[in-house]
């Protein structure tokens, strides 16, 4: 009986705080908003700015941790769909709170052809409302922002299925660019 009560209290607690997190995120970033600028380094120490991608579509994806099952699956699908994304004029950039060294190892291991940026203090993820705190640990949420060539948010993905996310973005880019579903 006590275990059952604990279970219900835990579910209510998670539902309440999960909803608050969802509500804050969903009302904070809107399609059509200017994408928050960023200045972050990649694994080779090269600095990347949002403005570097002006004139192109940018798939800016936040992910929790290098070389974990879901993050690896997502990154490898982006890798495998790069030709399609590039044909649509899109660049892909991944961001997590991992170090540049961790990104370097992850990118080498899976032959990732796009930059992984180190947001070690979580400030960029926070500006996109894509940061969660587990007590003292900060982790990027699995969110993706499709940014149009003028720097506006064109699409926000907060419920990501890593097995088909990159193809979903390819399909959405085609619709955005042609207006045809």
Pin down the residues of each PLM region.
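Short loop/turn microsegments at loop-to-beta-strand junctions
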Residues: 35-36, 57, 141-143
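Structural microenvironment flanking redox-active thiols in thiol-disulfide oxidoreductases
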Residues: 72-112, 120-125
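Short, acidic, Ser/Thr-enriched surface-loop or helix-capping motifs
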Residues: 29, 42-43, 147-148
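Short active-site neighborhood of thiol/selenol oxidoreductases, capturing the structured segment around
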Residues: 51-72
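Thiol-/selenol-based redox modules, centered on thioredoxin-like
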Residues: 139-181
């Amino acid at each position: 009986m006590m275990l059952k009560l604990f279970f219900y209290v835990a579910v209510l607690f998670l539902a309440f705080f999960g909803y608050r997190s969802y509500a804050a995120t969903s009302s904070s970033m809107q399609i059509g908003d200017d994408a928050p600028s960023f200045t972050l380094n990649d694994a080779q120490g090269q600095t990347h700015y949002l403005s570097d991608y002006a004139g192109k579509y940018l798939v800016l994806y936040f992910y929790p941790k290098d070389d974990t099952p879901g993050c690896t699956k997502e990154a490898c699908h982006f890798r495998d769909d790069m030709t399609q994304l590039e044909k649509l004029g899109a660049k892909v950039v991944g961001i997590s709170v991992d170090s540049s060294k961790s990104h370097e190892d992850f990118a080498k291991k899976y032959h990732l052809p796009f930059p992984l940026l180190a947001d070690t203090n979580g400030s960029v993820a926070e500006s996109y409302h894509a940061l969660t705190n587990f007590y003292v640990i900060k982790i990027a949420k699995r969110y993706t922002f499709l940014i149009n060539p003028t720097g506006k948010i064109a699409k926000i993905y907060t419920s990501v299925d890593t097995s088909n996310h990159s193809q979903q973005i390819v399909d959405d880019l085609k619709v955005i660019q042609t207006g045809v579903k």
